[in-house]
């Protein structure tokens, strides 16, 4: 489906990984076995992420007032949803873009890309988990605002700087294609705007008390 979307947007096959642009190889006796274990571990970590967030919430909840604790309890659900959305975004959008670009990039025709299995999986895991963490921005903003360390005014002042940083980052990790850059940067900008709304709502609620 993503391949069809990619072609519909005029991006070619940048979201497709039908045929790897490089050959994978194993250069260690136990490389495939340890890679299998690593994939199993991180898969388990992703699946159990709602429970991990719940345990984190149980650890920090005593620091909240009763009314605040009830209000923030839904944060466990939203943290889990945002994290899983980030993982999926990283796996289905960022990974194909990055792997296709990096796998076919050459400084010279004399150098061929033969990527080790461990390097490939490590890159994939890093991309997915990095996106999962980035998608936690609204939750982070919520807690920073509650602690008085962040205000919507500050976020609005640095909005342009943040958008520029997002565009630069998306240009680095994607091929030199404007459609790919928009596809990567748009969800991150939406997250930033959502975080501003969350921060403003918390400030209004605090002012009413």
Q: What are these model-predicted stretches?
A:
Residues 1-209:
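Membrane topogenic/interface segments and analogous intrinsically disordered interaction regions
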């Amino acid at each position: 489906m993503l391949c069809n979307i990619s072609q519909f947007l005029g991006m070619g096959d940048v979201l497709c990984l039908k045929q790897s642009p490089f050959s994978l190889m194993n250069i260690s006796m136990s490389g495939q076995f340890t890679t299998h274990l690593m994939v199993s571990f991180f898969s388990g970590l992703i699946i159990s992420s709602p429970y991990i967030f719940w345990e984190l919430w149980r650890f920090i909840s005593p620091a909240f007032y009763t009314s605040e604790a009830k209000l923030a309890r839904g944060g466990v659900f939203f943290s889990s949803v945002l994290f899983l959305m980030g993982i999926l975004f990283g796996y289905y959008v960022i990974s194909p873009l990055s792997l296709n670009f990096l796998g076919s990039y050459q400084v010279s025709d004399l150098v061929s890309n033969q990527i080790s299995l461990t390097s490939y999986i490590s890159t994939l895991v890093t991309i997915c988990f990095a996106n999962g963490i980035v998608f936690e921005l609204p939750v982070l903003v919520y807690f920073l605002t509650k602690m008085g360390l962040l205000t919507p005014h500050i976020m609005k002042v640095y909005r342009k700087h943040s958008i520029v940083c997002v565009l630069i980052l998306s240009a680095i990790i994607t091929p030199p294609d404007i459609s790919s850059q928009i596809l990567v940067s748009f969800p991150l900008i939406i997250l930033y705007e959502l975080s501003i709304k969350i921060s403003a709502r918390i400030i209004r609620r605090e002012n009413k008390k």
